[in-house]
Design a protein with these regions (language model features):
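Eukaryotic scaffold repeat domains enriched in small/polar residues
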Residues: 2-265
């Protein structure tokens, strides 16, 4: 089993591996790099992987859901009618209505001819069966900067507010912001950078403990809402988590230790 504890010794919980879950994949399927995991209201586990990252995985659907018994319940993904599919998947989220959100971004794609910053500049919304519902961003266009209200820049993560159906996107590999859209219509709502300020795409100083905290995000890599009504953003390049009200008002921040040592969280 596995037991996790924080640096103060408080135990987070005990976990044991179930070697029989999930069941073996169908014949001919092979997973590439898994870049996202989510759960839905039925306790199905969803994953998204990169078929183009592993030789022999090209025919495996990028999105796969397993039921509680580990059997494949859904599988789909790739280009389709009415939407565009990027070259580098990055992240998956299942909202309060069990709609599935898929992101694209994250470094250079496996295909060296693809344009990493423009091909992977969108977020897609589907039903659990893979029916296309909504596209935010565009393919082959890319960002117009962190103040663009239309285009994304290699988004990294998605969270949907069940109360408003607004979708919060950490737009972080090329841009430096959190951007919010109407999750039903795709209309732009608002965006912000570090400390709730307007984002700045200028040079980012290298993070150091000896300097003042950076005023801007540096690769915001996750966004999530909590039961306290606040929004938490992982600012990976600056080794911190920033906390906001839903309108982007800054609340607090916490820095991650530079060296966590052995097995600490």
């Amino acid at each position: 089993g596995l037991t996790l504890a924080d640096s103060g010794g408080d135990v987070a919980g005990g976990y044991a591996v179930d070697p029989f879950w999930p069941r073996p994949l169908p014949d001919g399927w092979l997973l590439g790099n898994v870049v996202g995991v989510a759960t839905d209201s039925r306790d199905h586990v969803w994953l998204i992987h990169r078929p183009n990252s592993q030789s022999g995985a090209a025919e495996t659907p990028p999105v796969i859901a397993f039921d509680t018994e580990g059997v494949v319940a859904h599988s789909w993904g790739g280009p389709g009618e009415g939407y565009e599919w990027g070259t580098q998947t990055h992240g998956i989220y299942v909202d309060h209505e069990d709609n599935v959100w898929v992101g694209f971004g994250g470094g250079l794609p496996y295909d060296p001819t693809a344009r990493a910053t423009t091909d992977n500049a969108l977020v897609l919304k589907f039903t659990p069966d893979g029916e296309f519902l909504l596209q935010i961003g565009d393919f082959g266009v890319g960002t117009e900067g962190s103040d663009s209200t239309m285009f994304l820049g290699q988004p990294t993560d998605v969270w949907v507010d069940a109360g408003t159906s607004e979708v919060y996107i950490a737009d972080g590999y090329t841009n430096r912001r959190v951007i919010v859209f109407d999750g039903l219509t795709g209309e732009y709502v608002r965006h912000w950078g570090g400390y709730g300020n307007a984002p700045d795409d200028g040079p980012v100083p290298r993070f150091t403990r000896d300097a003042a905290p950076p005023s801007q995000f540096n690769t915001p890599h996750c966004v999530n809402g909590a039961t306290d009504g606040l929004v938490y953003v992982c600012d990976r390049g600056n080794q911190r988590i920033q906390v906001f009200q839903k309108d982007g008002t800054f609340v607090d921040e916490a820095f991650i230790e530079a060296d966590l040592g052995e097995g600490q969280l």
